[in-house]
Amino acid sequence: MTQLSQYYVPGLHVEDHVVQVPLHWNWAAGAAQPDASSFAGEHIDLFYRLVSSAQNVHADLPLLLFLQGGPGGMGPRPMSAQSIPWLSEAVKHFRVVLIDQRGTGRSSRVDSSLIRRRGQNARETADFLKNFLADSIIRDCEFLRTTVFNSAQWVTLGQSYGGFLTMAYVSLFPASIAASFVTGGIPHIPMNAREVYEHTVPRMMAKTKEYYGLYPDDEAVVGRIADFLSSEKVLLPNGDPASVRRLQMLGGDFGMKPSFERMHWTVDTAFNGEYLSDGFLMELFSSTTSYGSELYWVLQEFIYANKEIEPINWAANDVLRSTKQFDESSRPLMLIGEAALPEIFDEDSALRAFRPAMDELMSDTQWGTVYDEDQLARNDIPIHAAVYFDDMYVDSGLQLDTLSRVGNSHAWVTNEFEHDGARMGAVFEHLYAEALSRGHLEKLFLK
């Protein structure tokens, strides 16, 4: 481990660290240590931050590992103790570990320029990318826990995809965790990508209709934009094509608040006379570009892969194409939320280098073991989960179905928040208080 720096942001003490981890782990589930062969091959950086409140810098508080949403999400960068609601509460009770998951942020980031530099063929690139999924991420975390933090049990907090990682951690290394919190991110187990989109595509449609209901004039404006993009060759400021599909991808924000208002003001100045305004095209680019979040789209459908499966084969695209309301020519134009489509790998210059490997991955049937249903059924780790009833990204019904088969799990179902509730309100505070009241954190604070 190398400490890179330490500093304060208002109300928080922050330490930056980096450790080297194998690109490919050979580490049996539940084993105390990885196989020595893991360290014989290529290595990558794992960057993490240790965050404490300014008042508790030297306090011996228990550890909380934050598992970031994504996939392909780097750890949050706090501006102050108050800038992230869950963090402002967490540092009262814990030292918080923020990791940049492998391939993101400062952890040997994977982007199109790296893919080009590696110079591998499509199959080799696909195999390389498989090293950036949950089975590897959890082993990174476990390596950190055993080598840096003296094998101390820690609490985990998983937001969105971080909940998928939580279920993987509970499956693979259950003895490492004292308690877990999850916000908007219980995966459906057993997993099936097409099933997921069959549940979420209707939610995309409902969200679009809700938006048009709030701002009726926007329905015509969005349709007019789509008509213009269909009839003219329009380029975004970076030279990428501005397509109707790219316009539809603005719906990816609709699971957050205040997304409808953001969309309303985005299209408010879409036209300059008869033509699309430069400002709107810049907004379309900045809201839909994959620069800086390449793995979010590259790995999007493969977070539903576990062990041996049928080929995923562009599951979201298949469901959307079979739902005529999402055709580019349909009016009112339906907007799309969180769907990795083949078109974006052709149109978005940040993703084109990944396109050949995507076709390989979409046809693969063999994946790492991420979830152990038997282990989850006998789980005794307290898991407190916030399930957002109207969640557009992670269907609440599927979440509750999974939790019904996970031991010692406790769901708080609420329609007060959208998918980003942990960043917008006192969601973690509620879950923490519930766990405390049930005695689920008692052993952490016994001296």
Regions found by a protein language model. Give the residues of each.
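N-terminal, polar/Ser/Thr-rich
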Residues: 1-7
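Short, proline-enriched alpha-helix->beta-strand connector loops that line the catalytic pocket
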Residues: 245, 377-383, 406-408
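Short alpha-helix in the alpha/beta-hydrolase fold that links the catalytic acid
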Residues: 80, 266-268, 315, 395-404
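C-terminal structured domains
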Residues: 385, 400-412, 426
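Catalytic His-Asp charge-relay segment
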Residues: 250, 380-387, 391, 410-411
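Alpha/beta-hydrolase fold active-site neighborhood
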Residues: 234-364
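Conserved alpha/beta-hydrolase "acid-adjacent" motif
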Residues: 259-262, 391-398
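Gly/Pro-rich cap/lid or specificity-loop segments adjacent to the active site
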Residues: 8-44, 50-238, 352, 369-376, ...
